[in-house]
Amino acid sequence: MLITKKIRLKPTTEQEILFRKSAGVSRWAYNFFLGENERIYREYIDNGKVGKKSISEGDVRKYINNILKPTTHSWLKEVGSNVMKQGVKDASLALQRYFKGLSGKPKFKSKHKDRPSFYVNYESLSRKQGGFQGEKIGF
């Protein structure tokens, strides 16, 4: 059974810039979700434990797509939509694991200390003559 396949990429300068932007968007989405959850929880405690205790992954994605992307955060459009979606999903999963007692409290990702990475959905990749075609990235 084939579980993973490792490939070596030789990106052009433009593609390398897009990879770095994708890693930055993923980190930003992860940190944004954690920050929003902390803010909502603080409001919940300050209001005498009345209202929402946390915010859902779907609500944050809708807020980013409908409010932030068209106005102040237009740079989010430069990378594939799955990159931002996966960053939010990873943060949501980290919080769920924390609340179940399976892991420690999730920390904000640092631009300089953490290894830049992002997830690419394998379904969005297709093999082409001499390379691969991905969401907003082609070889």
Regions found by a protein language model. Name each.
Residues 1-139:
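Nucleic-acid substrate recognition interfaces
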